[in-house]
Amino acid sequence: MNIFQLQSVGLSDNDKSILTDISFTVAEGERLTLVGPSGSGKSSILKLLAGLTSATSGTIFFQGRNIAELDMPTYRREVSYCFQQPVLFGQTVQDNLQFPFTIRQLAFDQTKALKALESVHLAPEFLSKKITELSGGEKQRVALIRNLLFEPKVLLLDEISAGLDAETKTIVNKLLADYQAAGNTLIEVTHDQSEIDAAQKILRIEGGRVQV
C-alpha cells in the first residue's frame, strides 16, 4: 500500500519554478532517499509532504486522501518533519520534549521520554539539562526523539546527519533503522552514503525534476 502518492506536483514562487511535474509513490514502511545537487528542490519536496507549503499544481495523496483536504494538526502528528538545524524551545531538554504535548493539551509520559533518551545514549539526568549546554549532536538527538514520542507513521528527515560525528551518526542510524523496522516510513534528503545505502528506493532530483 502506498502511504504517499504525488501526481504531477509543481511548486513555484513569484513565477519562479521550483518543482516541475513531480510524480512518485512511497510504499508504507519504505525508506526513500532523495539525492541530487544543492538547490535542486529536494527540501522543497519534504516541505510539501510535511504540509509546510502547498503545491501550486498537481496533487499529493496521503493514504489515498488529498492532503489539501486534511486537518493539518492531525496530519502533522502522523507525518513529522526533522530539520537539518534542530529547532529547540524553552530552557531544558524536558521543556522541549514536553512542549508539543502541552500545546495539544495531551499528557506527557516521562517514563516514555526517559526510554527515548536511553535509546539515543543520553542519560536520565539529561531531562534537566539546559539546551545551551548541549552539543550539536545532542541537540539533534533531542529534536529527533521529540518527534518520535508522538509515534508518527512517517519521518521526514532533511540532512539531519550533516555535521554529526561518526559516533552520533551511528546512534541516529540505529534509531532510524529500528523505527523503520516497526513498520514506519522514512523519507530523507541526505548526502551520506551509509544512509543512501540503507534506502529501499532512491530518487534523484535535478533542476526541480525527478531524473529517471
Task: State where each predicted segment sits.
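Conserved ABC ATPase signature
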Residues: K130-L134, E138
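Conserved ABC ATPase "signature" region
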Residues: F108-F126
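Helix-to-loop junction immediately C-terminal to a conserved catalytic motif
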Residues: A50
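Helix N-cap at the start of a conserved alpha-helix in ABC-type nucleotide-binding domains
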Residues: A166-T168
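Catalytic Walker B motif of ABC-type/P-loop ATPase nucleotide-binding domains
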Residues: L155-D158
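Hydrophobic anchor residue at the start of the ABC signature
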Residues: L144
